[in-house]
């Protein structure tokens, strides 16, 4: 943990987000007013022809849950981040605060890939899913979380196919719902 060895601050928002550095860059992971785009300076990736490429942050087209890597097919192998020196206790306090918020709102008692659905601008995916009556909706072993509808959890030995089918069904149901909300 960079906090323990170097007292570096800037990635506290990512504490508790499941995944890898490459995945975080790929989707511009973020939570609680922090995003990868705020701290990354560059990333290395491998192209389809096997060449290694370095991309500077300003060329990554980072936006809400999006990056250039979603279109170019490159595999991210590492990232360079701009972090600042901080006080250990302040960093620890922020991480504890954010994890407390996660525990109170997110279904951490079940395996999941974290927040599953991309939020429409100005709205919350979990609220839209709840409004469509999909809390607890299940496909195979995958379920829309009862605790937070923005999460798909592995309730009972879900397969990848269960999770993908559930995500697709929820998306289709949201777009065909007679809800008065703009889609």
Predicted regions, residues:
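Conserved small/polar residues in nucleotide/adenosyl-binding loops
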Residues: 1-4, 175-182
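Anion-binding (especially nucleotide phosphate/pyrophosphate-binding) glycine-rich loop
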Residues: 3-21
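N-terminal glycine-rich flavin-associated loop
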Residues: 3-8, 35-54
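Phosphate/pyrophosphate- and phosphate-bearing ligand-binding catalytic cores of soluble enzymes
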Residues: 46-165, 172-173, 177
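Active-site glycine-rich loop that binds ribose-phosphate moieties when present
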Residues: 24-31, 38-41, 54-66
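Short, well-ordered alpha-helical segments in soluble proteins
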Residues: 3, 21, 25, 29, ...
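Short Gly/Pro-enriched turn/cap motifs at secondary-structure boundaries
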Residues: 33-34, 107
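Gly/Ser/Thr-rich beta-alpha loop segments that engage phosphate groups in nucleotides
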Residues: 16-25, 32, 116, 152
């Amino acid at each position: 943990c960079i906090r323990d060895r170097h007292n570096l601050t800037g990635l506290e928002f990512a504490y508790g987000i499941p995944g890898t550095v490459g995945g975080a860059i790929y989707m511009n992971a973020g939570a609680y007013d922090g995003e990868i785009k705020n701290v990354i300076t560059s990333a290395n990736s491998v192209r389809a022809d096997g060449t290694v490429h370095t991309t500077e942050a300003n060329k990554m087209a980072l936006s809400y849950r999006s990056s250039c890597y979603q279109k170019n097919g490159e595999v991210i192998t590492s990232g360079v981040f701009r972090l600042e020196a901080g006080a250990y206790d302040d960093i620890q306090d922020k991480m504890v605060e954010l994890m407390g918020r996660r525990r109170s709102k997110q279904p951490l008692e079940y395996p999941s890939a974290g927040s599953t659905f991309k939020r429409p601008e100005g709205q919350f995916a979990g609220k839209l899913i709840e409004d469509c009556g999909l809390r607890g909706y299940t496909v195979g072993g995958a379920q829309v979380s009862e605790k937070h509808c923005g999460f798909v959890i592995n309730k009972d030995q879900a397969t990848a196919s269960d999770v993908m089918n559930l995500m697709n069904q929820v998306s289709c149901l949201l777009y065909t719902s007679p809800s008065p909300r703009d889609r």
